[in-house]
Amino acid sequence: METFSSKDMALKAQKKILSKMATKSMVQMIIDDTSSEILDELYRVSKEYTGNRSEAQKVVKDLIKVVVKIGVLFRHNRFNEEELKLAQNFQKKLRQGAMTAISFHEVDFTFDKTVMSDILTESRDMLLKLVNTHLTTKSHGRINHVFNHYADPELLTQLYNSSGPLKPHLNKICNGLNKLLENGTL
């Protein structure tokens, strides 16, 4: 028997359309200014670290696509009880990561690349488990791409180097994360 569902088709179409529209101008219409500023700084960090503009754009675009698709899944109540619990744990892990990033930034000589990398890796694994049955292999690849990029211990070391060229970006990222934590967004 054929199992056609217009609701499923609409969801797939919406995810596809939104992922195609993951441009900077479109993102600014969907997300708040603080999140947009953080994404801009993450792009700059990636660009300076890799020396490759297109790779930096791809990482941030992958991040945006994943966030949009997960938002669509939430909006359409696609997660079961177990997945919703996992989503809450993922959100807690992100919050922990943000607070850790800020703490490492604010308190000199406390940065530990292993701790930060582990938090990002654990977050990636939780997210992959959450979307396992909902997103395509290509989207799973995007999640891996984003988290593996930002969990790179060498990138993190350069980012937290107090006299390094990435320090101004870290300042802005942490200021943005602080705002998101204070207003309850994160």
Curated annotation (Swiss-Prot):
Record keyword Protease present: no
Q: Which GO terms describe its biological process?
A: innate immune response; regulation of apoptotic process
Pfam families per the record?
A: DUF758 (PF05527)
What are the entry keywords? Immunity, Innate immunity
Organism domain of life:
Eukaryota
The role this protein plays is:
Acts as a negative regulator of innate and adaptive immunity by maintaining immune homeostasis. Negative regulator of Toll-like receptor and T-cell receptor function. Prevents hyperresponsiveness of the immune system and maintains immune homeostasis. Inhibits jun/ap1 and NF-kappa-B activation. Promotes Fas-induced apoptosis.
Q: Which PANTHER family match?
A: TUMOR NECROSIS FACTOR ALPHA-INDUCED PROTEIN 8-LIKE PROTEIN 2, TUMOR NECROSIS FACTOR INDUCED PROTEIN
**Can you say what this protein is called?**
Tumor necrosis factor, alpha-induced protein 8-like protein 2 B
Organism of origin: Danio rerio
